[in-house]
Swiss-Prot record:
Gene Ontology CC: extracellular region
Lineage of origin: Eukaryota, Metazoa, Spiralia, Lophotrochozoa, Mollusca
Keyword annotations: Disulfide bond, Neurotoxin, Pyrrolidone carboxylic acid, Secreted, Toxin
Pyrrolidone carboxylic acid PTM sites in chain numbering: 27
Modification(s) after translation: Contains 3 disulfide bonds. They are not added, since framework IV presents two different connectivities (I-V, II-III, IV-VI and I-III, II-V, IV-VI).
Any one GO MF annotation of this record: toxin activity
Predominant cellular place of this UniProt entry's protein: secreted
Protein name per UniProt: Conotoxin ArMLKMS-01
Keyword Transmembrane: no
Superkingdom per UniProt: Eukaryota
């Protein structure tokens, strides 16, 4: 999956491609305000 996603970004520099892959790898189930940076599925007051 990640390889196919990176292949779709072939026109990007290696650093830009790595950024896309790293952002996909760091996806979390939950982030807590104010640390929601797009790297999570839900953003809430607590993840308990």
């Amino acid at each position: 999956l990640f390889e196919r996603y990176a292949e779709n970004k072939q026109d990007l520099s290696p650093d830009e491609r790595m950024g896309f892959i790293l952002s996909a790898l760091r996806q979390q189930e939950c982030c807590v305000y104010p640390f929601c940076d797009g790297g999570c599925y839900t953003c809430q007051d607590s993840c308990e």
